[in-house]
């Protein structure tokens, strides 16, 4: 993997191009990875995604907690002319393997000295560094993150934070020794919660490795995934990230998985982060929210989210978002999507997911254009206030309006918590 910085400014982050493997098109950064569950874009088939969301090859974010059961089959499937993306129905797309699903809350606890818990649909699995590398060798992703203990957040005690760093170093010592058996690019995990000393220790361990040991960094341990990322305190997060970035070399990409709000995402990009995912778009859709925040300068006051369960829109025949050219907004109305919610039709979350992904991908295109003209601060201020007088709230409240348990899973899903 090769990362080339094309533009670097003090106030607007950096533009780059990520070349993951020979023959594949380069990916422009800041990059939005497509979050998947079990190898699929939530609610969307590969055909729908490629025909109605984007035809451009994407970087798919796969999680071991949702595809661990595929490792045995993939050990027999993988060959020189086909791989993990082909197996899940996305040929031509690149992929990165993470441990935890950023869309769902990761349970706390279950940590052992030599074992990392992996919470799957079948329950908790015990994952040693050796077993992890065996699974990575079977799955053969294009990029994979190093095994780490990220069971920390803003409330974690100092002892828990230090244990997360020490256990991660132990896991990574084994992975660095055996990475030559895996023909994939490794991302070094940076953990340590909200403790600058612990984060520095984690960074030093990565920097001590021989040149070429890994291709980039993944920042973990700021939240427990799911909706927790949408409500974290950016005033605590940003100083820690700035502290870490100042110690890292410029020529390696930096990933921060999780459902960070659009505003926090912009602030992280301003500090030099490069790779994000679409878990925020999913968390909004699964909790009956359409993304309606603007990133185009105008004189209208906007709201960041549209609650499609609100009876006030039952006779509103306007699109989810004015001037949006996604399939959902071109062919359907707010009243119709509200009707789909009321009747628990499966088309409801499909239309919301199509819209949210389309809108969020357009948002990242606007981010790259803003960085190119050194205008990220202006975009950040627009997203912060939406032309209003005060900062808007991008947090996502859990869905509490499921019509009945008997219908859960048939249309709009239960809350992402």
From Swiss-Prot:
InterPro entries: QTRTD1, Queuine_tRNA-ribosyltrfase, TGT-like_sf, tRNA_ribo_trans-like. Binds 1 zinc ion per subunit. Zn(2+) binds at residues 324, 326, 329, 355. GO terms for biological process: tRNA-guanine transglycosylation. It comes from the Eukaryota. It is found in: Cytoplasm. Its cofactor is Zn(2+). GO terms for cellular component: cytoplasm. Keywords: Cytoplasm, Metal-binding, tRNA processing, Zinc. One of its GO terms (molecular function) is metal ion binding. Belongs to the queuine tRNA-ribosyltransferase family. QTRT2 subfamily. Non-catalytic subunit of the queuine tRNA-ribosyltransferase (TGT) that catalyzes the base-exchange of a guanine (G) residue with queuine (Q) at position 34 (anticodon wobble position) in tRNAs with GU(N) anticodons (tRNA-Asp, -Asn, -His and -Tyr), resulting in the hypermodified nucleoside queuosine (7-(((4,5-cis-dihydroxy-2-cyclopenten-1-yl)amino)methyl)-7-deazaguanosine). Heterodimer of a catalytic subunit and an accessory subunit. This is Queuine tRNA-ribosyltransferase accessory subunit 2. It comes from Drosophila pseudoobscura pseudoobscura (Fruit fly). The lineage of its organism: Eukaryota, Metazoa, Ecdysozoa, Arthropoda, Hexapoda.
